[in-house]
Amino acid sequence: VTVGASFRTLGERWDVVVIGAGVAGLSAARNLSDHGLSVVVVEARDRIGGQLYTDRGFTSVPVELGAGLIHGRDAYTWELVAEAEAETVLVGPSDQIADPLPTPEPPHDAEDAAAYLTRLGIPEDRWPPVSIDNEPMHRWSARWMHDSGLFDWWSTPRENFRVPDGYDRILSPLAHGLDIRLSHAVRRVHWSDRGVVLSVDALEGPTEIRADRCVITLPIGVLKSGDVVFSPELPDDHHEALRALDRTDALKLVYEFDRPVFPAEEDVLGWDEDTGFVFWCLSREDPEVVVAWAAGKNARRLTAMTVEDRFAAGLTALAEALDETIPEPVARTTHDWAMDEFSAGAYLFVPPGAHDAPAALAAPVRGVLYFMGEPTTGENTVEGAYVSGYDGTDLLMADL
């Protein structure tokens, strides 16, 4: 399946092949194509967007089953919002939610973030609430959080926005005119100084795609799973970086009710440590759409249940958060990113001792293989993916 123009037949050779049509892959292909290189994008799914996944067929409003927010008014994502002429709405509070760090000595290389903040004397209730979206602080590299500015990010007041007409609106400016092959799952990357040959499972059967260079924007879970084989194996530095990095799980449960259940003045019901849920109200119309979100250990607890029990747990937690009886939903849906074979988890996180791993993975492999996206930045945002694709391909073109 081709989105946009099909510039070449599969038997020909491209300047660059991009693996993955998520935001990082699309921004990489956009930058390369705009600079005159011949580019083909291969995507295992039957849609573009990767973990930006807008479901338009379930309820009366578009529902984000993956990424859902624009973080701050200065995010580069606003460039795409403007190009797509998309409307946005402000969501939730903009208050500072963690204490700024003093000016201390930097963390030790193998120190976890919880131990570091404890050593600085910062009360636990003022730590960055990263466990809402990811793993708890004791699983994070303090050195990486310090060096990447993540502690400062959480201590800075920041407004969040969503796109009510669907976050996937921002994909159109990136994908326009690109040669994108959907339902093309890469199984093997044969690489050498002469270029790459991809072994691909497509709907019409196995095929090969040849290019001088390859951009790889696969999620960390897929890279670690070994489902995509590199032949020959990646250099030791890249192999060790993949081993050191890890991924977390996340789960969204979406409910449609035939009457409003959320307080009129609230968009978000904050994280409850006991249930592990955050709740979002997506529509104040009849019907009303509510999203229950869990990540990390809370998501793993839920995914160990049956699907019915997951939905029941979400409703019970919502009733507790509202302190009232709520009606049965008229419709519901979910997406389990851990069981999604083309994701194999939700977000990346950087464990203690792995602070150098994203940069190591981002290093070009003999001017042929270029890794981009979340595993090379450690950033869990659409903005991070967007910037990574552009920055990474600027580096690629500088090598030409």
Report residues per predicted region.
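FAD-dinucleotide binding site
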Residues: 1-400
